[in-house]
């Protein structure tokens, strides 16, 4: 009987963790097109540059802010995007506060409802990555790490973290620290962090509940 109860509890933990993973994946990121400027003809950052430096994933949303009645957002095909043809949109948004769900891993193309504005550059193309990616890090390349930074992974796998000053001063090829990776030398993550690495990310509340149940089971044995 005790074995059956413990099995049920373990099954519940697995189900809760799976539920948390599903909830986390369904909560996409909200991107504000044009930033503070909104969906305008001349934003402070060019739309193509803004799109290039961001990573878009399935279930993310694009938020278009503009003056209702004076502009609109049209989702179009790639051909119509290139020619600024606004006569056959796939989707038309005109409420002034428009949200567009990126529901699949594909390229999406948007133009202003004013064809003249589109010809002047008010158009946006985004490419949505597959669900296998779980990061919204910018796409532009980061500065190349120094040769001494490459063994950081090895340092993480060692029983105890190597002091930063020793890693920098030692002439031997011991792990070093790049300024942009200063947080990597923190204490090795626990089981919950391992789950996040495998599954993308899991709701913290669900993990906490699972750990509490594990502790309760351990006290019963």
Swiss-Prot record:
Confined to flowers. Disulfide bonds join 84-118. Residues 1-21 form the signal peptide. Keywords: Cell membrane, Disulfide bond, Glycoprotein, GPI-anchor, Lipoprotein, Membrane, Signal. This is Early nodulin-like protein 4. Residues 198-221 form a propeptide. GO terms for cellular component: plasma membrane; side of membrane. Belongs to the early nodulin-like (ENODL) family. A lipid is attached at residue 197 (GPI-anchor amidated asparagine). It comes from Arabidopsis thaliana.
């Amino acid at each position: 009987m005790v074995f059956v109860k413990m099995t049920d509890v373990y099954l519940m933990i697995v189900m809760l963790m799976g539920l948390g993973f599903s909830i986390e994946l369904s909560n996409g990121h909200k991107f504000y097109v044009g930033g503070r400027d909104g969906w305008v003809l001349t934003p402070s950052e060019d739309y193509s540059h803004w799109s290039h430096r961001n990573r878009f994933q399935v279930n993310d949303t694009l938020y278009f802010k503009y003056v209702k009645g004076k502009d609109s957002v049209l989702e179009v095909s790639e051909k119509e995007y290139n020619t600024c043809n606004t006569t056959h949109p796939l989707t038309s948004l005109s409420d002034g506060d428009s949200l567009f769900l990126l529901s699949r891993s594909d390229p999406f193309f948007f133009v202003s409802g004013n064809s003249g504005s589109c010809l002047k550059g008010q158009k946006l193309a985004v490419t949505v990555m597959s669900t296998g990616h779980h990061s919204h890090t910018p796409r532009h390349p980061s500065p190349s790490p120094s040769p001494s930074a490459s063994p950081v992974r090895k340092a993480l796998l060692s029983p105890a973290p190597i002091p930063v000053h020793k890693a920098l001063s030692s002439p031997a090829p011991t792990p070093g620290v790049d300024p942009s990776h200063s947080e990597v030398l923190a204490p090795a993550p626990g089981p919950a962090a391992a789950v996040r690495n495998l599954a993308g990310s899991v709701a913290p509340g669900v993990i906490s509940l699972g750990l509490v149940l594990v502790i309760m089971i351990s006290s019963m044995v």
